[in-house]
UniProtKB/Swiss-Prot annotation:
GO terms for cellular component: extracellular space; periplasmic space. It comes from the Bacteria. SMART domains: YceI. Keywords: Periplasm, Signal. This is Protein YceI. The keyword Signal applies. It is found in: Periplasm. Coiled coil: none annotated. Disulfide bonds: none annotated. Residues 1-22 form the signal peptide. Belongs to the UPF0312 family. Type 1 subfamily. Its main location: periplasm.
Length: 191
């Protein structure tokens, strides 16, 4: 009886220790603590910045075991906003995002590796009907308790994509072939 009680206690401690380490988070879209931004050079003379205003996602974060981390994000591509209505309409057209045919973009991580202070998050990005691997360099900004009794974790990530890789063939000149992704998310831990 003592052995089985000891075994049960040990097993429950192992289970609690493991579950306390990995945590699932929902991106805080409602509180506006998350941003999916981008920039591209305009003719090589300046940077044009934009954002996607409507997206949702989740992530699993285990600080001690990055290989267990996961990220899943869905972006409503019709929500693209560059602070210029005519340009946004053009970006939604078949020349760029083709939102009538592909109203969503998705990112699903396939691996997460620690690289010094950063995490290299590699995953499949589906955009404009094309799926390609993309690596984002992410950094933990902070984590801990919030004033409402919950727990939060925040990250910033950056990456690059080439327009032609996602079947976007509009030629904006040699300086405008790549898009920089600048992402900031805060997640609320799920219970």
């Amino acid at each position: 009886m003592k052995k089985s009680l000891l075994g049960l206690t040990f097993a429950s401690l192992m289970f609690s220790a493991g579950s306390a380490v990995a945590a699932d988070y929902k991106i805080d879209k409602e509180g506006q603590h998350a941003f999916v931004n981008f920039r591209i050079q305009h003719l090589g003379y300046s940077w044009l910045y934009g954002t996607f205003k409507d997206f949702d996602g989740t992530f699993t974060f285990d600080e001690k075991n990055p290989a267990a981390d996961k990220v899943n994000v869905t972006i409503n591509t019709t929500s693209v906003d560059t602070n210029h209505a005519e340009r946004d309409k053009h970006l939604r057209s078949a020349d760029f995002l083709n939102t009538a045919k592909y109203p969503q973009a998705t990112f699903t991580s396939t691996s997460v590796k620690k690289d010094g202070d950063e995490l290299d998050i590699t995953g499949d990005l589906t955009l404009n009907g094309v799926t390609k691997p993309v690596t984002l360099e992410a950094k933990l900004i902070g984590q801990g308790d919030d004033p409402w009794g919950g727990k939060r974790a925040g990250f910033e990530a950056e990456g690059k994509i080439k327009l032609k890789d996602f079947n976007i063939k509009t030629d904006l000149g040699p300086a405008s072939q790549e898009v920089d992704l600048i992402i900031s998310v805060e997640g609320v831990q799920q219970k």
